[in-house]
């Protein structure tokens, strides 16, 4: 099974491709950080993130898209951008007929 892990963010969005090998062994295929310019309008930033995630899905063909859940922060603007980026990942996964799941940051750290 191949998983695209997404640590959503509007300024920096972490993407990783992980392959499940036999048993509980996994192989990190690639990791990348996609950045957008905070000077650009949010619609342009989301469109660029959409294009980037779409290209990663086309290139690596994951079975599952795992999105880290947005947790409550004090900065509402930051939470909104993170939630919007997560939504882009959800939509791209669904369009590619991938299983889309979400995990808390604690669950992600415990599994690595």
Regions found by a protein language model. Name each.
Residues 1-112:
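Phosphate- and other anionic-substrate recognition elements at nucleic-acid/protein interfaces
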